[in-house]
Structures are given as structure tokens and as C-alpha cells.
């Protein structure tokens, strides 16, 4: 980054992104997690559009649009969950969901909450931002986004799957299907890519699919875990 312009802005937003990431992993309730997710959406947007070229800005705006829409859908799901459970504390939500005889009535709410996390993780069909964003961002930003941004989305998926729908076979099957499609699609896109950074981006998307498959398996295995 020594020869790059806007270095001070870059490092400032890198620290903000790292701080938001720490907030996500240290949060004890879903609403606090959501707040830090949205902070990360805007700080990582600046990292993607660092070069300020036309295609760079368009790619960054695509990412921001997906992130904002995903965040709004997740917020709707959080409101609905709070109305049902009266809390968004993760430990209390786990106890609440385990006390329900029919968790299927919460599937729609779970999908809404998952939507924003899936957008961050780059899951199909919300992956449209990922290849271009990784390609146009500076190499240090691409590395940061690859190791942090998508993994926070995976962390959100783990929260929904293991806190709300632990050992739920139907939910696990749904997550498993998303993981398989993401894994295969990412690999296919990587094979046909002619840009090295885009190839690595699509490969990262495929690897996310592998992780999501593992999350889905905990539901399918059920009480055998």
C-alpha cells in the first residue's frame, strides 16, 4: 500500500472493520450482532471502492446494495423473533426454541434472519457481489475480506443453525442444499475465470460452500451429534 493514494482512509477503515468483526464475535444477543454486521457493511464498502475507478465503484455499490437489503430482511426477522420470544439473547433463544414442540413455525423467521448472514457469506443466490468485489479491491483488502467478511457471514449462519435450530433435520437439509449449490457453483465459476483474483474469489466461494455443508450436517445428524 506504500504507493497507493488514500492510505490514511484505507487504514482507518481497516481498523473499523477489525473492530466491527470483534464486536460480532463477542456479542451475546442477535441485535448487537446485527448492529456490528451493518457497521462492517459500510466499512468494507470503502475498502472495496478504494481505487475509485468506474468499475470499482459499481462493484462496491453492488456489494453495498446486497448487504443493505440483506440487513433489512434480517432486521425484519429479528423483530418477528422478538415478538415471538420476547428476547434476542442467544442463550435465552436457545432455551426458548428447545421448549417449542413444533419449531417448524419458526422456519420463515429463521430464513429471514439467515438472509443477511448468507449475503455476507456469499451463499447462493446472494453471491453476485463476491467475484467482482474481490477482483477490484486492492490485494490487502481482498485478503481481509476473504478471511473476515465471509467468515462473519458463516458465523451468523452457525448462530441461526446451532442456536435456533439445533439438531433440526429439515433446517439442516435446507442449509445443506445451499452449501452444495454454493460449493459447486463457486468451483465452476473458478474454472472458467481468466482473472487470477476472480479465480481465487470464486474458489473462496466454493470453500464457503464446504463450510456450510458441515453446518447443515449437524442438523441432519440430529441427536447423533
Task: Report the location of each language-model feature.
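Short phosphate-coordinating micro-motif centered on Lys-Gly-acidic
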Residues: 38
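Alpha-helical transmembrane segments of multi-pass membrane proteins
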Residues: 12-15
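Hydrophobic transmembrane alpha-helices and their helix-loop junctions in integral membrane proteins
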Residues: 1-8, 18-33, 43-225
Amino acid at each position: 500500500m506504500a504507493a497507493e493514494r488514500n492510505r490514511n482512509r484505507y487504514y482507518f477503515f481497516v481498523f473499523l472493520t477489525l473492530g466491527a468483526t470483534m464486536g460480532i464475535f463477542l456479542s451475546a444477543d442477535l441485535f448487537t450482532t446485527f448492529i456490528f454486521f451493518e457497521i462492517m457493511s459500510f466499512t468494507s464498502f470503502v475498502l472495496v471502492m478504494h481505487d475509485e475507478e468506474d468499475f470499482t465503484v459499481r462493484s462496491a455499490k453492488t456489494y453495498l446494495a446486497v448487504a443493505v437489503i440483506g440487513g433489512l430482511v434480517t432486521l425484519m426477522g429479528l423483530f418477528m423473533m422478538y415478538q415471538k420470544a420476547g428476547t434476542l439473547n442467544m442463550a435465552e433463544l436457545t432455551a426458548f426454541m428447545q421448549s417449542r414442540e413444533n419449531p417448524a413455525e419458526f422456519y420463515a423467521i429463521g430464513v429471514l434472519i439467515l438472509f443477511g448472514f448468507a449475503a455476507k457469506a456469499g451463499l447462493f443466490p446472494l453471491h453476485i457481489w463476491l467475484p467482482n468485489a474481490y477482483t477490484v479491491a486492492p490485494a490487502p483488502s481482498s485478503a481481509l475480506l476473504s478471511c473476515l467478511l465471509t467468515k462473519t457471514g458463516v458465523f451468523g449462519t452457525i448462530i441461526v443453525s446451532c442456536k435456533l435450530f439445533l439438531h433440526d433435520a429439515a433446517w439442516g437439509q435446507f442449509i445443506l442444499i445451499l452449501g452444495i449449490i454454493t460449493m459447486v457453483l463457486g468451483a465452476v465459476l473458478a474454472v472458467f475465470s481468466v482473472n487470477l483474483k476472480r479465480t481465487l474469489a470464486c474458489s473462496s466461494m466454493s470453500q464457503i460452500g464446504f463450510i456450510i455443508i458441515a453446518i447443515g450436517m449437524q442438523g441432519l445428524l440430529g441427536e447423533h451429534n
